[in-house]
UniProtKB/Swiss-Prot annotation:
InterPro entries xrefs: G3P_acylTferase_PlsY (IPR003811)
One example of a Gene Ontology biological process annotation: phospholipid biosynthetic process
Enzyme class per UniProt: transferase
Reactions this protein catalyses: an acyl phosphate + sn-glycerol 3-phosphate = a 1-acyl-sn-glycero-3-phosphate + phosphate
Name used for this protein in its record: Glycerol-3-phosphate acyltransferase
Protein's cellular compartments: Cell membrane
Segments crossing the lipid bilayer: 1-21, 53-73, 78-98, 112-132, 152-172
Assembly information from the UniProt record: Probably interacts with PlsX.
Biological or metabolic pathway of the protein: Lipid metabolism; phospholipid metabolism
Amino acid sequence: MIILAALLAYILGSVPFGYLTSKYLWGVDITKKGSGNIGATNVYRNLGPYPGAITAIGDVGKGMLAVYIGSLLAGERGALVASFFVVIGHAYSIFLKFHGGKIVATTFGVLIMTSIKVTVVVFFIWLTVMLISRYVSLGSIVCGLSIPLIMLLFGLDLSYIYLGIFLAVMIFYRHRDNIKRLRSGTENKIGTRKNG
């Protein structure tokens, strides 16, 4: 059942809500707009708040659902395995030739099902950094790197600390282009509509 939990989580994570929302509700191929990313930030910057919100809700929701299904299939171990694979699916979607999003929204879905306390603190870090710097990407990177530390602070089991480290590394890696733009001073701030 662990293998089934992993497989279902990967498939669910692969569902590209940003692409589907943009393509079939707004008639736009989001992979050809802005940064080409399927995440909520790029959708918002190119199509507006409603498509962005739908994308974010879908990406958070699939993270939550994958963990829930994993727990039904194989208890806590199933939930933990699903947490890894739903994020991998979102980053490397089988439906988009193994391209995907930057995993932040799906990570929040996983965190909601793991620990509300951790979720609230990580979200506060993301929001604070984003509002102060006006860079969504910087907020995402900093909150991602904080995940294992916040999990450790709240005394989560070692297996979840490993999950937190994995999420931190993945978020950092998926934002490598943003990091280059931040360093060069070309990253878009809140209110601009080019890179996502």
